[in-house]
């Protein structure tokens, strides 16, 4: 068995990335030639990301609560635990918690991007 202990504390999400209170725990950081990064992102009720894109796309996996997401020009979609959402490369989108519910997700993207 190998246990890799976390060496970082929970970070408050930056105000220019999020509206409302959002907290981030790093899950995977790039090693060697990898460009993979992942984070566990905790959204308080009504908190969400700003509109944004990822040049290589982004996958989120809802682990707890009820969330919402939207791509530009599309309807707001409700997402729940077990739902996986893939945003296409360059697709303008946002994601976050429903107005009255917490939501936690695992976000994955290139390490040079926010997750």
Language-model regions, residue ranges each:
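A short, N-terminal "cap"/entry segment at the start of jelly-roll beta-barrel domains
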Residues: 1-35
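Conserved small/polar residues in nucleotide/adenosyl-binding loops
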Residues: 109-115
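Short beta-strand His + acidic residue motifs that chelate non-heme Fe in jelly-roll/DSBH
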Residues: 49-51, 69-70, 87, 92-99
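Conserved short histidine dyad/triad with adjacent acidic residue
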Residues: 23-26, 37-54, 89
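Glycine- and acidic-residue-biased ligand/ion/polar-headgroup-sensing regions
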Residues: 45, 55-73
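Short acidic-glycine-tyrosine-enriched beta hairpin
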Residues: 73-90
């Amino acid at each position: 068995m190998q246990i890799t202990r976390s060496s970082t504390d929970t970070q408050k999400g930056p105000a220019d990335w999020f509206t409302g209170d959002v907290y981030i725990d790093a899950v995977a950081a790039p090693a060697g030639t990898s460009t993979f990064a992942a984070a566990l992102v905790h959204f308080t009720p009504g908190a969400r990301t700003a509109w944004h894109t990822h040049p290589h796309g982004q996958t989120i996996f809802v682990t707890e609560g009820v969330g919402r997401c939207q791509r530009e020009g599309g309807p707001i979609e409700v997402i729940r635990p077990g739902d996986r959402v893939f945003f296409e490369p360059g697709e303008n989108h946002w994601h976050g918690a429903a107005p009255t519910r917490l939501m936690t997700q695992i976000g994955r993207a290139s390490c040079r991007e926010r997750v």
